[in-house]
Design a protein with these regions (language model features):
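C-terminal motif of bacterial Sec signal peptides marking the signal peptidase cleavage site
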Residues: 17-20
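Bacterial signal peptide processing site
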Residues: 22-25
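Active-site- and interface-proximal helix/loop "cap" or "latch" segments in soluble metabolic
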Residues: 28, 33-36, 45-53, 57-161, ...
Length: 170
């Protein structure tokens, strides 16, 4: 019976992972060309209002740069203060360490995307599964926008930031 419960739990988490993918973001097809430029994608917000933002640089049709951040509902980025209480103190060291483990995974996800080239091939870092789901959604959106631009025969300007889902302004 315990085995069935564990498998059932995996099914629920798998369904949640699929549901996390944005309905407006088509699946990423790595066989399609990418337009050069800097592309930004955002995930749907989580239950606390935080969302992931992936900035992907494409040059020569290849992913050459990647950054991933999580933006909290108040607009601040999850960083070294994530997991501290409202006074900026570490009230619970264990919770703070867990929060910081998730934050450290952001750079791992971004680096791995450059290495593997496909968001779905970026492995989950233990302790950062919600961030991974948001990363997948945001990176897929950014790369899909690049592919749609390539299909239209245009490129995004290099450098700068952009609105979600488009080339960055230079």
């Amino acid at each position: 019976m315990a085995r069935l419960v564990r498998l059932g739990g995996l099914g629920v988490f798998g369904a949640l992972g699929l549901a996390a993918c944005g309905a407006d973001t088509p699946p990423y097809d790595s066989s399609l060309p990418l337009a050069d430029g800097v592309w930004v994608g955002e995930s749907a917000p989580d239950e606390e209002g935080a969302f992931g933002r992936s900035t992907v640089t494409v040059s020569g049709g290849k992913i050459t740069g990647s950054q991933y951040v999580t933006v909290q509902a108040n607009g601040s980025m999850k960083g070294e203060d994530y997991g501290k209480d409202s006074s900026g103190e570490i009230a619970n060291r264990s919770a703070y360490r867990a929060a910081q483990k998730a934050v450290s995974a952001f750079d791992v996800y971004a680096r791995d995307l450059i290495e593997v080239g496909v968001p779905a091939d970026v492995d989950v870092v233990s302790g950062a599964t919600i961030a991974h789901g948001q990363f997948l959604e945001a990176a897929t959106e950014a790369l899909t926008e690049s592919q749609m631009a390539a299909e239209r025969g245009r490129t995004g300007p290099a450098g700068g930031g952009s609105e979600s889902g488009g080339p960055a302004d230079g």
